[in-house]
Amino acid sequence: MATVAEQWVLVEMVQALYEAPAYHLILEGILILWIIRLVFSKTYKLQERSDLTAKEKEELIEEWQPEPLVPPVSRNHPALNYNIVSGPPTHNIVVNGKECVNFASFNFLGLLANPRVKAAAFASLKKYGVGTCGPRGFYGTFDVHLDLEERLAKFMKTEEAIIYSYGFSTIASAIPAYSKRGDIVFVDSAACFAIQKGLQASRSDIKLFKHNDVADLERLLKEQEIEDQKNPRKARVTRRFIVAEGLYMNTGTICPLPELVRLKYKYKARIFLEESLSFGVLGEHGRGVTEHYGISIDDIDLISANMENALASVGGFCCGRSFVVDHQRLSGQGYCFSASLPPLLAAAAIEALNIMEENPGIFAVLKKKCQTIHKSLQGVSGLKVVGESLCPALHLQLEESTGSRERDMKLLQEIVEQCMNKGIALTQARYLDKEEKCLPPPSIRVVVTVEQTDEELQRAAATIREAAQAVLL
């Protein structure tokens, strides 16, 4: 039976061959021959190769020009013309051998040279040594780390806190720990560089809204809502985040947090709040922008801040609900793969928190000094003040740009140098021009601390005014 079936199939094949059109048979024959040629032919013929003569080799070597390892850099680049600081960058700072009043370092509460903070750091140094030599998951967790996390959570009135060993890596690690490919992040166009790097690492879909423009943010949220209605299945697994700063590092302006919270609940998004500039500055007790507006901390999904400004230490922290913070212990890159915070710096931060809790009036003092310098700098010829009157890091920008960023920076640097010659230490705000998503205009940054006297604030304003007139007029 099987033999009969095989014969029948063979007959059908022969019959199909006879009935096939001629062009079909020709095409199949050509393809078969081409495949045979590919299988048996060589990729190149040895006889076609010819060796270069010694003279030709020398000519090629002489003509070859290697590409530069790094791009060309101007001799006037700030990184090649740095100032040298001698001693701690406290209230008075010695720059290039000249003593100046410090209006450049982010020592807002003046705790960098506080005797109690230094004593706590020294005691920790004697007990633990300098570093930990390992990440938190590998014998890098010391009892002082747990104490600091507990104190930060208690101070911020959240369930839990987590500390990082470097301030920049805090928000840059926290964002990609939650926001992944396919998620959508709505972020302010003036977001600081650390936020930008976190967004880049997350590989999420980034939507920029105009700086502090709630209407523009709502427009983007509405557009996304319409897109979600077209594909409900995808929308169910797509998370939406709003990322903002309490006080913006690049502009000195405060975020409209009440409006952001309203949009959060209306469009079912999560809020990440970066408070490096507002922690220890805003609010009656220094808890940041949530306390400033009287908003419940539970309305914010994640708060991050560094400890390198108000706390005068190093590192950063995130705080929020326990399940949110615990996720970072497994997914926060800067937490899992970096050596933990040196214990002496954790001890210093704890003592700084003690001082903040014992002396809440310090925040009102800082606010008053910020308002004083903000008012004193109004009307400086050729310069405009950018930032809120309650921000301790103001920006002075040119009223009218020359049309060249390099030229603008050169003019501002001349003002900085003239002020330094008169005993006022300032600095320009520095950016990685080619990597910034929205590059801010050149500016001089003026930093206020509680240690500066009213006389020094007025003197600084007068010095800036004189330097601006000399350079710009």
From Swiss-Prot:
Keywords of the record: Acyltransferase, Coiled coil, Endoplasmic reticulum, Lipid metabolism, Membrane, Phosphoprotein, Pyridoxal phosphate, Sphingolipid metabolism, Transferase, Transmembrane, Transmembrane helix
Subcellular location: Endoplasmic reticulum membrane
Family of this protein: Belongs to the class-II pyridoxal-phosphate-dependent aminotransferase family.
Chain positions found as Phosphotyrosine: Y164
Domain of life, per lineage: Eukaryota
Entry's Gene Ontology cellular component terms: endoplasmic reticulum; endoplasmic reticulum membrane; serine palmitoyltransferase complex
Taxon lineage: Eukaryota, Metazoa, Chordata, Craniata, Vertebrata
Name the UniProt record assigns to this protein: Serine palmitoyltransferase 1
SUPFAM superfamilies listed in its UniProt record: PLP-dependent transferases
EC number in record: 2.3.1.50
Pathway in which the depicted protein is active: Lipid metabolism; sphingolipid metabolism
InterPro entries on file: Aminotransferase_I/II_large (IPR004839), AON_synthase_class-II (IPR050087), PyrdxlP-dep_Trfase (IPR015424), PyrdxlP-dep_Trfase_major (IPR015421), PyrdxlP-dep_Trfase_small (IPR015422)
Reactions it catalyzes: L-serine + hexadecanoyl-CoA + H(+) = 3-oxosphinganine + CO2 + CoA; octadecanoyl-CoA + L-serine + H(+) = 3-oxoeicosasphinganine + CO2 + CoA; tetradecanoyl-CoA + L-serine + H(+) = 3-oxohexadecasphinganine + CO2 + CoA; dodecanoyl-CoA + L-serine + H(+) = 3-oxotetradecasphinganine + CO2 + CoA
Cytoplasmic side: 37-473
Enzyme class: transferase
UniProt main location, coarse: endoplasmic reticulum
Stretches the record annotates as Interaction with SPTLC2: 1-66
Domain remarks in the Swiss-Prot or TrEMBL record: The transmembrane domain is involved in the interaction with ORMDL3.
Single Gene Ontology BP annotation: sphingomyelin biosynthetic process
UniProt key word Coiled coil: yes
Tissue specificity field: Expressed in astrocytes.
Gene: Sptlc1
Subunit (UniProt): Component of the serine palmitoyltransferase (SPT) complex, which is also composed of SPTLC2 or SPTLC3 and SPTSSA or SPTSSB. The heterodimer with SPTLC2 or SPTLC3 forms the catalytic core of the enzyme, while SPTSSA or SPTSSB subunits determine substrate specificity. SPT also interacts with ORMDL proteins, especially ORMDL3, which negatively regulate SPT activity in the presence of ceramides. Forms dimers of heterodimers with SPTLC2. Interacts with RTN4 (isoform B).
Up-regulation conditions: Expression in increased by palmitate at the protein level, but not at the mRNA level. Expression is down-regulated by microRNA miR-137 and miR-181c (at protein level).
Transmembrane portions of the chain: 16-36
Membrane topology: Single-pass membrane protein
Cofactor(s) for this UniProt protein: pyridoxal 5'-phosphate
Regulation: SPT complex catalytic activity is negatively regulated by ORMDL proteins, including ORMDL3, in the presence of ceramides. This mechanism allows to maintain ceramide levels at sufficient concentrations for the production of complex sphingolipids, but which prevents the accumulation of ceramides to levels that trigger apoptosis.
